[in-house]
A protein has these predicted regions:
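Active-site-adjacent "subsite" loops/lids of carbohydrate-active enzymes
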Residues: 1-39
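Substrate-binding cleft of secreted/luminal carbohydrate-active enzymes
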Residues: 125, 130-178
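Aromatic-lined carbohydrate-recognition surfaces of secreted/lumenal glycan-active proteins
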Residues: 50-53, 76-120, 155-167
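Generic structural signal for well-ordered alpha-helices
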Residues: 38-39, 82-93, 121-124, 143-151
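Active-site groove signature of glycoside hydrolases
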Residues: 25-26, 34-63
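Extracytoplasmic/secreted cell-surface and envelope-processing proteins
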Residues: 1, 58-61, 111-115, 143-146
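Aromatic- and acidic-residue-enriched segments that line the glycan-binding/catalytic groove
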Residues: 1-15, 57-73
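Soluble non-cytosolic domains of exported or imported proteins
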Residues: 24-32, 79-86, 144
Length: 178
């Protein structure tokens, strides 16, 4: 999408390791586009917005990404990527009608560490206070530890495990549809 995507250092569209393009959370036009979709969804009656892949790329030639829109803010701790993601979540929160739940999906490693482990800018400690719920693919065994990590980052943010990872092989009589 013209004027909204991540660029490489040569000024061309950045393709990650999966040959996918990414919107640049540092660009106002990209954030406005996503907020318009979210606003339309809530106008149609959706009561929860679950945002997935709210990060910068973590695969491909990461050193070739033009991160000029993700420079660390003066007098702020951490990475400008995290600051951009947090700013985006604050903007989304501002356009949501009263009573609409804002949720974010993170991976279990990010939740356990509390910080961006994959250089994508996701940091539980920065993002959890801005949303109502954190979702994560998890096994039943790791659910309580992940829930505790989310609570430690924000006492107002809930945790919802996506029990998609089987702790043990399913019996042959079970059918798993994904």
């Amino acid at each position: 999408v013209e004027g909204m995507g991540l660029k490489n250092t040569g000024g061309y569209i950045f393709y990650d390791g999966n040959n996918s393009q990414w919107l640049d959370p540092g660009k106002e036009k990209a954030r406005d586009y996503l907020k318009s979709i979210i606003t339309e969804a809530t106008a149609k009656g959706f009561t929860e917005i679950l945002l997935t892949d709210v990060s910068y790329p973590t695969a491909g030639k990461l050193d070739k990404i033009d991160l000029s829109n993700a420079q660390a803010v003066e007098n702020a701790d951490g990475d400008g990527r995290t600051a951009n993601l947090a700013a985006f979540l604050r903007e989304v929160r501002a356009v949501l009608p009263e009573g609409v739940t804002l949720s974010l999906e993170l991976d279990a490693d990010t939740i356990r560490s509390g910080a961006a482990v994959n250089t994508g800018g996701q940091a539980l400690t920065e993002l959890a206070p801005l949303v109502d719920r954190i979702y994560a693919p998890a096994t039943a065994e790791e659910t309580s530890a992940l829930a505790e990590a989310v609570r430690a980052a924000s006492d107002r943010c809930g945790f919802v495990p996506e029990l998609t990872a089987a702790a043990e092989p399913l019996p042959e009589s079970c059918l798993l549809v994904q």
